[in-house]
Amino acid sequence: FITYISAIGGQAFGVWLLGLSVNNFSLVAGINACFFLVSASILFLGKSKLSLSLSSADGEILKNEKLSIKEQFLTIYRNLRLVFLKGGQKNFGFMIFAVLLINALGGALGSIYNIFFLSHSLLDFSYTEALFISQFCALLAIIISSLTGNDYFGKQSLPRLMMWVTVGLSLVGLANLFNQVVLGLLFICSTLYVSAKVQPKISALLLKNLAPEVLARTSNFLGLLFTLSIPVGTACFSLVAVWNIQLTWMLFVGLSLLAIFLTVINLKNDI
C-alpha cells in the first residue's frame, strides 16, 4: 500500500516537473536517474543491515546443492509445471505464455499513452494533466483491488481472471483505436482492477504446492520472467507508436486477441 501511495506522489511530482520544464523530457529523465542513484547508494551503504541469517538446516541445503545452471533451470521448470498441474492446468506452456503476453501488454500501456496523448486529448486537459489523470486512475484501481481481495473476482480461478483481463485489454485497444479516449481510460481502470488479482493467485498456488526450500527460488524465477516481459513489451510498442500510433493500437488488439485464444485453451482445462 505504501508503494502505491509513493507511486502516486512520484507521478504527481513528475507531471508537475514536466509541466514546469515545458515538456523537457531530458531534464525529467535525469532527475529520475538521480533518484535511482540515491536509492542505490542508500541500499549499498546499509547492505550490512539487510543480511539474512540462515538456519543450520538451510545452510546444509545450500552446501549440498551443487547443481549446474541447466539443472537448476530444469528443476525450476518441473516445479512450476507441477504447481500448475496441481492447480488444474494441463497446458502449462500456454498458461505461462499467456501470462507473459498479458504482462507485456499491460506494461506497455504507459509508454503507449505517453505518445498517444501527444496527439489526442483527454477531455481538453493538457498533456501533463492527461498523463497524471490516467496514471492516478490506474494506481487507484490497483489500490482498490488490493483492498478488496474477497470480492467476486478474488474468488475466481486463475484462467477466468486471465480471460477477464485479456478481454479488457482488447477493449482498451479498440476504444483507443476509434479515438474513444475516455472509454479507453475506463476500460484500463477496470482491467487493472482485475489484473491486480492475478499475481496473488499465482503466489497462492506456489505457496500451497511448493516446499519451503524451493519456494523462493521458483517464485523469484517466475517473477524474473514477468519483470523481463514488461521492458520487452514497452520497447516494441514504443518503437511502433513513434512511427504510427494507430498501427500500435491495431497490434495491441491483435496480441490481445491472441492472449484471449490462449486463455480460452486454459479455461477449457480449468478442472
Predicted regions and their residues:
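C-terminal transmembrane helical hairpin of 12-TM major facilitator-type secondary transporters
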Residues: 158-199
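Substrate-agnostic recognition of the 12-TM MFS/MFS-like secondary transporter fold
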Residues: 1-18, 99-110, 146, 187-239
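Juxtamembrane intracellular "pre-TM" segments in multi-pass secondary transporters
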Residues: 49-95
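Alpha-helical transmembrane segments of multi-pass secondary-active solute transporters
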Residues: 27-32, 130-131, 161, 218, ...
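Helix-loop junctions on the cytosolic side of multi-pass membrane transporters
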Residues: 29-62, 265-271
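Transmembrane alpha-helix termini and helix-breaking/packing motifs in multi-pass membrane transporters
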Residues: 8-31, 119-120, 232-249
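Helix-to-loop junctions at the C-terminal end of transmembrane segments
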Residues: 18, 144-157, 241-242
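A single, central transmembrane helix in multi-pass transporters
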Residues: 22-27, 75-144
